[in-house]
Regions:
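Generic alpha-helical structural signal
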Residues: 8, 12, 43-44, 57, ...
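Carbohydrate-interacting regions of secretory-pathway proteins
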Residues: 47-304
Length: 304
């Protein structure tokens, strides 16, 4: 998440080595299409009410392999709960299996209809080839917002932001595994409610360091442990200690959420940890943020 409220206007396709991307044939699923459109464009409650969160006792598949019915779309650029440009769709064959496609054309997300707490989120993703203005030549960017609370769009005072109050699992070339704390406004009072989290960092630094000093953060990005200090916001950027796989390969990320604590893993490597968070439950938002991405597994596992 780098740009607050963009106006993407056009795509660019890039080729990648065949040994990385392979044959990515995919077609849109048509069975049950009207049911899918009706179910995932209907708005969730916008009064800011938070229903009782579900604690998984068995695996909950947020992507069922067929449609997007567990989610509601949020795209401020196209009116909120409408998706005329099919930013989000299901493809039935990407590397041999169905997946969610997030085109990246407009900033926004798929918001889960239900709230959750105390879980292990497991997601498998890979980047596509398409990038969009204003991030056409910048690092491929995406993310997953955890513990989303309040109204969609409440990260902006006018409730027209792509994002909402949450703790983000950042997915970006060179920075996958960062934590971003996103505050959100309350409509009734106009107050900005921050997302608060304590992380171990060295004094004056914003890189997670398990040997550091506990520091309370209320906004912004805290970098994963080995993010390259020389990182630049350029397409295809990679750091010498990145654990995200090269573009076109599948990655597995995990977010372990217990109470106000969060721990992130990228391809089996622990990259960051936060404790004593003010957000302990909420919806889950899958972002669209200027770069095509595919998600073939999105599931919540019980902690025990």
């Amino acid at each position: 998440m780098n740009s607050p409220n963009p106006s993407p206007i056009g795509p660019r396709r890039r080729q990648a080595p065949a040994n990385r991307l392979g044959r990515a044939r995919f077609t849109l699923i048509r069975s049950g299409l009207m049911l899918g459109i009706l179910s995932w464009t209907m708005p969730i409650c916008t009064a800011g009410a938070q229903e009782k969160a579900i604690v998984p006792t068995e695996v909950i598949a947020l992507f069922n392999g067929r449609d997007l019915s567990p989610f509601v779309v949020w795209l401020p650029a196209t009116g909120g709960h409408a998706d005329p440009d099919r930013v989000f769709s299901v493809v039935d064959n990407i590397d041999g299996a169905p997946a969610i496609r997030s085109s990246g054309q407009h900033f926004g997300g798929l918001i889960s209809r239900q709230s959750f707490r105390d879980y292990r989120l497991v997601v498998e993703y890979r980047w596509g080839l398409i990038t969009w203005k204003p991030r056409m030549d910048r690092a491929r960017d995406n993310g997953i917002l955890l513990h989303c609370q309040g109204e969609p769009g409440n990260a902006g005072r006018k409730f027209d932001s792509p994002w909402m109050r949450s703790v983000e699992f950042q997915i970006i070339e060179g920075g996958t595994g960062d934590i971003i704390l996103v505050g959100g406004f309350e409509r009734a009072t106009g107050d900005l409610i921050p997302a608060v989290l304590t992380l171990m960092v060295q004094p004056g630094q914003k890189y997670w360091d398990p040997t550091g000093v506990p520091t309370k953060f209320t906004k912004g990005r805290i970098n994963w442990q080995y993010r390259d200090p020389a990182w630049t916001d350029t397409l295809g950027v990679r750091g010498p200690r990145d654990v995200e796989k090269p573009t076109g390969e599948w990655n597995r990320i995990e977010a372990v959420c217990k109470g106000g604590d969060v721990t992130y893993f990228v391809n089996g490597t622990k990259v960051i940890e936060g404790t004593n968070g003010s957000l302990k439950e909420g919806r889950i938002l899958l972002q669209s943020e200027g770069a095509e991405i595919f998600l073939r597994r999105v599931e919540l596992q019980p902690l025990n």
